[in-house]
Amino acid sequence: MPASLAAVKHKIDSTKSTRQITSAMQMVSTAKLNQIQHHTQTYEVYAEKVKQMLSDLVKSHSATSAASQDDVYAALFKKRAVKKTGVLVITSDRGLVGSYNSNIIKQTLDMMAKHNLDKDNTVFLTVGKTGTEFFKKRGMNVVYEYSGVSDVPTYREVHSIVKTAVQMYSDQVFDEMYMVYSHYVNRITSNVIVHDVLPITEKSLLDDENEAQENTELNNSDVSTAHVSAEYEFEPSDTEIISALVAQYAESLIYGAILDAKTSEHSSSANAMRSATDNADDIISTLELQYNRARQAAITTEITEITGGMTAQE
């Protein structure tokens, strides 16, 4: 086999081996995506109930009367002068996820520019090695970092992230907090979201509830789904119930974002590996065509030489 043919054959074999790897990784990412989607849908039912109950309480006199007595309510609901801004950035630990990480980091930098934030008035809480390494290399103040989030994170697993973020806000390590993460839309699309989480505002809480109710009504247009605010009786007391519920709501936002981000990560990984597999198929087709043409040319040359030799003998 001529050297040129051997080189092309080697490229074909190498590309086929790479294709097998990317195809397998695509299937693994797709399986992880299916698994976490089921988990996320189950959690969203709980999170929506917490939000709905808190929204009802905010609109009721009970929350107003309890607010002056409740340290947690005051800490998480009441705005204060902003000296430091906390930014919770959720990225992946590894690569091979397409533009997933770069989009999140770009959106974070854009958000900082929009709100006039710099390393002197901003602290970072980072989930994922990519974000941690990026901001540390640029001299940013990373006050909390976490890596190794599992493929389907449970609340118990990421409990320290959630609790630390809320506690740091309560301890005035920062006076407001944003979350930046990739929101899963569908298997093709993900959008980076910048969400102002703390302090919790009544407007955002009620807007979220109205949006959720509108979506429910659209999905169930043939059924009356209007939400009726409930009358609550408190045991042991309204102050204790509201205190627990406000903290749960803040924590549910953060945990929900981690689940959403992980879902988007698996989707991005599956898409990146599918794209790599498709590209490998294109390369293999091109190389095989090149190989066949070169082989045909070599055969034609050999036949011509043999024919020429026989003619010369005659």
Curated annotation (Swiss-Prot):
Record's bilayer topology term: Peripheral membrane protein
Highest taxon of source: Bacteria
One example GO MF annotation: proton-transporting ATP synthase activity, rotational mechanism
A single BP term in Gene Ontology: proton motive force-driven plasma membrane ATP synthesis
Localisation per UniProt entry: Cell membrane
The entry's keywords: ATP synthesis, Cell membrane, CF(1), Hydrogen ion transport, Ion transport, Membrane, Transport
Keyword Signal attached: no
Cysteines paired by S-S bonds: none
Main location, first listed in the record: membrane
Family matches, as InterPro entries: ATP_synth_F1_ATPase_gsu, ATP_synth_F1_gsu
GO cellular component, one term: proton-transporting ATP synthase complex
Assembly, per entry: F-type ATPases have 2 components, CF(1) - the catalytic core - and CF(0) - the membrane proton channel. CF(1) has five subunits: alpha(3), beta(3), gamma(1), delta(1), epsilon(1). CF(0) has three main subunits: a, b and c.
Protein function: Produces ATP from ADP in the presence of a proton gradient across the membrane. The gamma chain is believed to be important in regulating ATPase activity and the flow of protons through the CF(0) complex.
Family to which this protein belongs: Belongs to the ATPase gamma chain family.
Name of the protein in question: ATP synthase gamma chain
Organism name: Limosilactobacillus reuteri (strain DSM 20016) (Lactobacillus reuteri)
